[in-house]
């Protein structure tokens, strides 16, 4: 009873702050923060070696299919045993790399591709499922999904999906476009692309990913007098300028003419939403 009273008291204590947070939700309070894992901050900018992502690129070309709704779907049901073996082999080869000895551009491409490979692998290994959130392999009584599970070891360190996103990519690169590159196997997530990310043209690829998502209805849209945005901007507002005005400025940077006009006319964000249904079927 005491714990329940404290929880209810905390909820009501937070109401004034939430009211000032515009479109932000209670769910945003539980979103992981950028918490740097200093071990992975090391790089060697003199190293010109490149990482081969051709196996992943081949998987993407064969199994990612654009839908009529502008959302890329993954053909999980079509992945044969030899394809799964190729994915497993790719994960093993990426895990064996001394990634801290590479330059930062190679590292960024590495972590993005590894995150997406692992996400596909974890769905294949635990499917069929209707949503990735049903893959309850993370430790902790209140945890759901696979994000807290140590999925592999890199340079002797156990690494989770949460580590890659929130302890490596977000804190060390501080680039909001990262959110458009990482795919969480859900319809509400930015598209899983048909090409692997490459250090040689990362900026172009990230810009395209940002433009594609923001100008799709699941990124931002004006509907029935409401400006509805992806929950990504609710959960990670700090990455997009820190407040509602910052999110709007970020959206305008990549928005097409119609969305810019809608943002300028409406002037605010009303609510956020997200579709956790799986981005494909078995």
Model-derived features: positions:
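Sec/Tat signal peptide C-region and signal peptidase I cleavage site
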Residues: 17-20
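Bacterial N-terminal signal peptides
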Residues: 5-15
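Interaction/scaffold regions that mediate signaling and macromolecular assembly across diverse proteins
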Residues: 22-112, 116-282
